[in-house]
Amino acid sequence: MSSFLYTVTSFFILDSSKGERVIAKYYNNDFDTLQKQKAFEKKVFDKTSKVNFGGEITLLDNYLVVYKSFSNIIIYMVGDQNQNEIALLYVLNSFIDTLQNLFENSQINKKLILDGINYTLLTLDEIIDGGIIMESDSAVIADRVGIKAPDNDDLDESINKAVTSVKEQLFNFLK
């Protein structure tokens, strides 16, 4: 059964200038200490930060690494070398699409990620549970996270209902 499951061993976001950790989640025991995690992140950063053509997929120490670079961060998703690289890249893109949807198409950057850390982590948790990829549809994920502001039409309708209710209560009180 496990051959039908897509899994992730780790997910992290690094500062693109220094390779410092912004966010990291590890899902297996290969990197059970902070020292091992940071050493792996450094190796990944050293390999991927030198790529000038914007590569999105690489192999490192029996791990498949997919990543996307932005203005001041790099977002990484790591699976074992037997995972489907297209599936991992699709899930990474779904994570990014969800964030762009939730943050109203704002440019993804370190400040946005840190200012919206709760939403960023909740989005990640909706996609990955214990290392198993549970969802990859960005619209479904954004709906589950549910932080979008209401549309103006919905807000107007809510205000109109409240005003009508107050009028009715006032009218009944004055009778």
Swiss-Prot record:
Any Gene Ontology biological process: retrograde vesicle-mediated transport, Golgi to endoplasmic reticulum
Pfam families: Clat_adaptor_s
Gene3D superfamilies referenced in this protein's UniProt entry, alphabetically: 3.30.450.60
One Gene Ontology cellular component: COPI vesicle coat
InterPro entries, A to Z: AP_mu_sigma_su, Coatomer_zeta, Longin-like_dom_sf
Annotated membrane topology: Peripheral membrane protein
Alphabetical UniProt keywords: Cytoplasm, Cytoplasmic vesicle, ER-Golgi transport, Golgi apparatus, Membrane, Protein transport, Transport
Subcellular location: Cytoplasm; Golgi apparatus membrane; Cytoplasmic vesicle, COPI-coated vesicle membrane
Similarity annotation: Belongs to the adaptor complexes small subunit family.
Quaternary assembly: Oligomeric complex that consists of at least the alpha, beta, beta', gamma, delta, epsilon and zeta subunits.
Function comment: The coatomer is a cytosolic protein complex that binds to dilysine motifs and reversibly associates with Golgi non-clathrin-coated vesicles, which further mediate biosynthetic protein transport from the ER, via the Golgi up to the trans Golgi network. Coatomer complex is required for budding from Golgi membranes, and is essential for the retrograde Golgi-to-ER transport of dilysine-tagged proteins. The zeta subunit may be involved in regulating the coat assembly and, hence, the rate of biosynthetic protein transport due to its association-dissociation properties with the coatomer complex.
Protein name as it appears in the record: Probable coatomer subunit zeta-A
Species assigned in the record: Dictyostelium discoideum
Record gene name: copZa
